[in-house]
Amino acid sequence: MRKQSDQAQKTLVDNELFNNVLPELQSRYSIDTNKIIYGGYSLGGLAAVYSLYRTNIPSAVFSICGSFWYPEFVNFCKENPVINQNASVYLCNGKTEGIHHHNILDTAPQCAEKIHALIRKQLN
């Protein structure tokens, strides 16, 4: 149940951003749609990477220390295709990130390696 709720929440954020906020900005400003970049740090980085699986709008996506340890995110990426095949992607995670937390954060380096490999495989 939590998995569906979390996925629905991420989808709502992307829907709000790409279906409501972006069109509103485009109606007010001259925006080059070939230069839309979506990125973030920590949970924002996870959301940006998640968007690769949900929309092809951003021309580039970046994640700095993305929270790829988030429950079921690695499985989500394994089970779903990247939709945004043309995006430039930049991922940056520390190799010792979270290792002294003694909880789910301990898995951060391994999860990051898996996400990096999955995206690399799907985009090449």
Language-model region placement:
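Non-catalytic cap/lid and distal C-terminal segments of serine-dependent acyl enzymes
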Residues: 1-124
